[in-house]
UniProtKB/Swiss-Prot annotation:
Keywords: Acetylation, Cyclin. This is Cyclin-Q. Residues 1-21 are annotated as: Disordered. Silencing with siRNAs phenocopies CDK10 silencing in increasing c-Raf and in conferring tamoxifen resistance to breast cancer cells. GO terms for molecular function: cyclin-dependent protein serine/threonine kinase regulator activity.
Amino acid sequence: MEAPEGGGGGPAARGPEGQPAPEARVHFRVARFIMEAGVKLGMRSIPIATACTIYHKFFCETNLDAYDPYLIAMSSIYLAGKVEEQHLRTRDIINVSNRYFNPSGEPLELDSRFWELRDSIVQCELLMLRVLRFQVSFQHPHKYLLHYLVSLQNWLNRHSWQRTPVAVTAWALLRDSYHGALCLRFQAQHIAVAVLYLALQVYGVEVPAEVEAEKPWWQVFNDDLTKPIIDNIVSDLIQIYTMDTEIP
């Protein structure tokens, strides 16, 4: 099973003239593979987020040139399934990955090549656990975003809420944030507020009575959050979408 040449990466890594650095291109494309493979495997959103986070964290600790990023990605999916108690068979991960890279190809036979790949995934999982010092449980923004959306829905005019897909957009922004390493650079609560902030900005939705309030709506959700933090997260999100247009 051959992976295509890597491309796309975390928004923080930019090369000359603002172009994505080579490492960033690889990580973006591999994260996209994790998400698409995860969907085909029937993974829930949290296990997929965990797989992406494990992948990004591993390469924060190691050199990209030393490891096959797609093998690391497959092992991340396998490990995330264990961490989030949605266990996956290595055979299914291999078959889905093979179909991803070879859409018109035949399923892999249970031959020596298959068993070598299976053993590589298992051995790679053990390597990753050691590199990450067995710290593979993460706090994701999802539960915070759900809480914030419920609160915001109660604040907003019902008509405004129903005619604009703020919630759908916020969830999409959160999902796409895992193409980069935002999950490692920012607190989960801050990311949840930032994607909600950006979703409101996209549709021009204003929170009622914000002008008269003692503090902005987003600080009600999180006292230690500042506007520069939101701006940094939003900037990284925008760079992710910019990178998406640059990478086939």
